[in-house]
Amino acid sequence: MSTNKKINLTEFLNQQYLCECLTVREIETLLEFTDEVTFAKGEIIADVGEVGEALYFVVSGEAALVHPEEGGGSLELAHANEGEMLGSMSFFDREPRSIRIVAVKANTKLLRLRRIMYQRLRIEHPFIAVNLLEDAIVSLDRLFRRVTQDVATYSKYLYGGKR
C-alpha cells in the first residue's frame, strides 16, 4: 500500500466509529492487518452458503445485503455505506451466510480483514480487536433495528392499525 493511500485510509478511519477510541498509530497498526479490495457494480462480495473468512469495512461506494429469490430475483434487505462493517455474523459464528453481499456502486472499495490476520490482531493488539468487536455489535444492532422497523412498517401496511 502506497504511503499516500495509507495516509488517506488512516484519516478516513480516524473519522469512523470503529476507530473513535484508537490513536493514529493504532489505526496504522490495524491497516497493517488489512488489504484493500475493489468491486465493480453488481459484483458479489460474499455469497449465500459461504462461511465468512473475512470482515469488510466500506471505504468508498456502497454495498447491499440481498436475499436471492427463486427464479433469479433478489430482495434487498439493507445497505452498507462508507464506514460500515460487513460480514460480521458469518465471520464470528462461522455459520454459512444467509444473504449475499453485492457492490451497489462502481469501484466500491473495502478494507478486508482475513480471519488469520484477525487471529493475529487479537493476540498482538487486543485493544484494537476489542474495538472491532464493539463495532461488529453496533453494526448488527443497527441492522436489526432497521429490519425490525421495516417489518413493523410492512406489518402495519398489510394488517392495518390495531386489531
Label for each model-derived stretch:
Residues 1-163:
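Cytosolic regulatory regions built on CNB/CRP/Popeye-like sensor folds
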